[in-house]
Design a protein with these regions (language model features):
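Glycine-centered tight-turn and secondary-structure capping sites
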Residues: 54-58
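RNA-contacting regions in translation and RNA-metabolism proteins
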Residues: 1-50, 63, 67-85
Length: 85
C-alpha cells in the first residue's frame, strides 16, 4: 500500500466528510489545483446539498476548513477549500 501525498490526503478527507453529509453522495466531486506552496481543494456537490455542506451561518464549512487547516499544518503546505455550486 502506497502512502498518499498531502494533497491526496486532503482531497480524500474532504470527500469522505462531504459524502457523509449529503443526500446525493454520488454527485460529490473533489479536485485539487496545486501550486508551489498552496493547493486549492474544490468541492462540488449537488445544488440541493449545498446547504448541508455549508450549514447554518457557515458552521459546517468552517468546521471542514478547520480540519483542512490541521492537515495543512502537518503537511507544511497551505490548503484552501472552495465550495462550488
Amino acid at each position: 500500500m502506497t502512502e498518499l501525498g498531502p494533497t491526496d490526503s486532503a482531497k480524500e478527507l474532504i470527500e469522505r466528510i462531504a459524502r457523509a453529509l449529503v443526500d446525493h453522495p454520488d454527485q460529490v466531486r473533489v479536485t485539487a489545483v496545486q501550486g508551489e506552496n498552496t493547493s486549492v481543494i474544490e468541492l462540488t456537490v449537488a445544488k440541493e446539498d449545498m446547504g448541508k455542506v455549508i450549514g447554518k451561518q457557515g458552521r459546517i464549512a468552517i468546521a471542514i476548513r478547520t480540519l483542512l487547516n490541521n492537515v495543512s499544518m502537518k503537511a507544511r503546505k497551505r490548503f484552501v477549500l472552495e465550495i462550488i455550486e
